[in-house]
Design a protein with these regions (language model features):
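H/E-rich (His + Asp/Glu) clusters that bind or coordinate divalent metals
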Residues: 2-13, 201-332
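Active-site neighborhood of phospho(di)ester-bond hydrolases with catalytic His/Asp-centered motifs
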Residues: 25-27, 78-79, 102-104, 127, ...
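Active-site gating/metal-coordination segments in enzymes
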Residues: 3-8, 83-173, 220-224
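Active-site environment of divalent metal-dependent phosphoester hydrolases
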Residues: 30-35, 83-86, 108-110, 133-135, ...
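An N-terminally biased module of ancient metal coordination in phosphate/nucleic-acid-related enzymes
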Residues: 1-80
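Histidine-centered catalytic micro-motifs
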Residues: 23-34, 165-169, 198-201
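Distinct, well-ordered alpha-helical segments
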Residues: 87-92, 111-119, 174-190, 205-218, ...
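Short, well-ordered coil/turn segments that N-cap beta-strands
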Residues: 20-23, 70-76, 96-101, 121-124, ...
Length: 332
């Protein structure tokens, strides 16, 4: 499939290519094949994966990255789709030094199951998700707590092996939620060898959420990282740099969602995805009349990173920070 429009090509040529480093490390990618699901499984009509034929294999990721970033060498850290019907024993099949994978994990998994899954895939860590915890504990998804997402036994194993966790924090308050803040800090203190990567900068997609966060408290914990997946806001990225070490900020995109056409915007202390395509993601507002010519969320994220990051530090955030983290885990 071809993704780029003439407008995308112009954006890359005029805005991105002159400023991007030669290598980019995307720390937040979902890779999934149809065979990860039961036979006959189909996604709802407006699910993002349907844009790509009902799956997003790593071969397609490689092809599309060569199209949208033709002058860059792409590295990735990836995980499967957090879906209750997915086979969590299927971790993305990555190859070579530039590709890393994490195993999906549910609180229902024994340590033995988790260890086997990680060792079989040579995974650098795990990706829990709130829907697994909700299912296991019989909670509504919005009632899930950070402590619900991994068991103490799983965390002890991850701490012993010094692996990483990419954690999408729960609850409607996101990074401003006092319980989230307390439990996130508690994990970092109790499991100092686990590299905690809080996805989407703690899901702080709008300014008030990060202003009411405790991001500065995490600066003293060397095992804490934040990824920037789906953050389109220059101001939020700048605020992060002002209150947390830039050397532990990881560029991430949330591909394949990031390959949809749209932009995340702040509206009245909330956020919404203005969309040029009719796919169901979060708080999407669809331009049904086709008035606006959108580029991809991927390019909007790169625009934000370039605008927010000092030129001398851009390569750190877009490549070096993730490179050091994930190669360090793999080579330990």
């Amino acid at each position: 499939m071809m993704l780029m429009s003439e407008n995308d090509c112009r954006i890359y040529r005029e805005e991105l290519a002159p400023k991007l480093p030669p290598r980019i490390f995307d720390a937040h990618v979902h890779i999934m094949r149809k065979e990860y699901f039961p036979e006959g499984f189909t996604f709802p009509e407006r699910n993002t994966f349907n844009k790509f034929g009902g799956e997003f294999p790593v071969e397609l990721w490689r092809k599309l990255m060569a199209e949208i970033l033709p002058e860059q060498e792409l590295w990735l850290n990836c995980f499967s789709a957090p879906h209750l019907q997915v086979d969590n024993d299927r971790t993305p099949e990555v190859e070579g030094e530039k590709e890393f994978a994490m195993a999906m994990v549910s609180p229902a998994d024994t340590v033995e199951t988790l260890a086997r899954r990680i060792e079989a895939a040579k995974a650098v860590g795990v990706k829990p998700y709130l829907n697994y915890a909700a299912h296991v504990y019989g909670k509504k998804e919005n009632d899930v707590e950070v402590f619900d997402m991994l068991t103490p036994e799983q965390l002890e194993y991850l701490n012993e092996k010094a692996l990483a966790v990419t954690l999408h924090i729960p609850r409607s308050g996101r990074f401003a939620d006092p319980l989230n803040q307390k439990q996130m800090i508690a994990l970092c203190e109790k499991y100092p060898n686990v590299k905690f990567i809080f996805a989407h900068i703690g899901r702080a997609y709008f300014m008030r959420n990060i202003l009411e966060s405790n991001i500065e408290e995490f600066a003293k914990y060397p095992n804490v990282y934040f990824d920037t997946a789906m953050i389109n806001s220059v101001e939020i990225v700048k605020y992060t740099y002002d209150h947390f070490p830039l050397e532990r900020v990881l560029f991430g995109t949330d591909t394949p969602i990031a390959l949809l056409r749209g932009k995340s915007v702040e509206i009245n202390n909330q956020y919404a995805y203005l969309m040029g395509e009719n796919y169901a993601i979060g708080s999407a507002i669809i331009d049904t009349s086709g008035v606006v010519e959108f580029t991809t969320f991927f390019y909007e994220q790169l625009r934000a990173m370039i605008a927010a990051t000092p030129e001398k530090d851009l390569e750190k955030v877009l490549f070096t920070n993730a490179y050091k983290l994930f190669t360090g885990i793999r080579n330990a």
